[in-house]
């Protein structure tokens, strides 16, 4: 009985294989490290180019950056509040741009052309380590926001409006980073896998509209993550009466 011609392409689809670098006792995930810094470098280059010659009438990259600045400012002001939103704009903006560029970079850049000894390159946000790290950073940020603005009064939140809420709000502190990390990871990984499988099955036809749909959902996921991060920070600094 002969082997089906469809078996080999599916066998070549690598899921869960990683390239690791060992530096002393530290084990670094090479794929995420490389793609993250490539995309961060591209983002920094865009910012430098857009702000090199600032004009009163913005054009090109400067116009794009000013649009993003206004968008992030409105997002932070709406979710965090007028009082302290300016302090958190850089953080929310960095989260949004990094996730957005990572998601789109995974979809648009032909990473598979770069061969690795093990695994393959892809969106940093398609790796659970990246999304968990971002989610934990958000958790630390809203704890810091609450304590820095209210001091020990922040813990009144856990018994507001009634002490019965204490166990539920403690559980909520664990579910927030879990939902943030797994939502982002699951959506981006699923998008990459669907496109990869369709490329094997129906190359050059069906994957194209799916890729455009993936770009849309990738942008939405970046917006959801940044919006929830800002909302959690706003919730932490909100005064309860």
Swiss-Prot record:
Protein role: Key component of the proton channel; it plays a direct role in the translocation of protons across the membrane.
Domain of life: Bacteria
Entry's transmembrane regions: 30-50, 91-111, 128-148, 193-213, 214-234
PANTHER family cross-referenced by the UniProt entry: ATP SYNTHASE SUBUNIT A, CHLOROPLASTIC
Topology with respect to the bilayer: Multi-pass membrane protein
GO cellular component, one term: plasma membrane-derived thylakoid membrane
UniProt keyword annotations, A-Z: ATP synthesis, CF(0), Hydrogen ion transport, Ion transport, Membrane, Thylakoid, Transmembrane, Transmembrane helix, Transport
Name of this protein: ATP synthase subunit a
Main localization, broad class: membrane
Keyword Ion transport tagged: yes
Protein family: Belongs to the ATPase A chain family.
GO molecular function terms listed in the Swiss-Prot or TrEMBL record: proton-transporting ATP synthase activity, rotational mechanism
Keyword hit for Ion transport: yes
Name of a matching Pfam family: ATP-synt_A
Lineage of source species: Bacteria, Bacillati, Cyanobacteriota, Cyanophyceae, Synechococcales
InterPro entries listed in its UniProt record: ATP_syn_F0_a_bact/chloroplast, ATP_synth_F0_asu, ATP_synth_F0_asu_AS, F0_ATP_A_sf
SUPFAM superfamilies documented for this protein: F1F0 ATP synthase subunit A (SSF81336)
Subunit text: F-type ATPases have 2 components, CF(1) - the catalytic core - and CF(0) - the membrane proton channel. CF(1) has five subunits: alpha(3), beta(3), gamma(1), delta(1), epsilon(1). CF(0) has four main subunits: a, b, b' and c.
Cellular compartment(s): Cellular thylakoid membrane
């Amino acid at each position: 009985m002969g082997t089906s011609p469809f078996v080999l392409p599916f066998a070549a689809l690598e899921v869960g294989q990683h390239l690791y670098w060992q530096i002393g006792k530290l084990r670094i995930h090479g794929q995420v490290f490389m793609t993250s810094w490539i995309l961060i470098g591209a983002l920094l280059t865009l910012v430098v180019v857009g702000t090199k010659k600032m004009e009163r009438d913005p054009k090109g990259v400067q116009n794009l950056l000013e649009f993003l600045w206004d968008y992030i400012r409105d997002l932070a002001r709406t979710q965090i509040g007028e009082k302290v939103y300016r302090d958190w704009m850089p953080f929310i903006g960095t989260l949004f741009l990094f996730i957005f560029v990572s998601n789109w970079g995974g979809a648009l850049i032909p990473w598979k052309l770069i061969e690795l000894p093990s695994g393959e390159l892809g969106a940093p946000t398609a790796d659970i380590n990246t999304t968990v790290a971002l989610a934990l950073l958000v958790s630390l940020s809203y704890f810091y926001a609450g304590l820095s603005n209210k001091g020990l009064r922040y813990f009144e939140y856990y018994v507001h409006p009634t002490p019965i809420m204490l166990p539920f709000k403690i559980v909520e502190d664990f579910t927030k980073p879990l939902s943030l990390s797994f939502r982002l990871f699951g959506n981006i990984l699923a998008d990459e896998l669907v496109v990869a499988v369709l490329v094997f099955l129906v190359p050059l036809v069906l994957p194209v509209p799916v890729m455009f749909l993936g770009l849309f959902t990738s942008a939405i996921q970046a917006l959801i993550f940044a919006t929830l991060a800002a909302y959690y920070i706003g919730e932490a600094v909100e005064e309860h009466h």
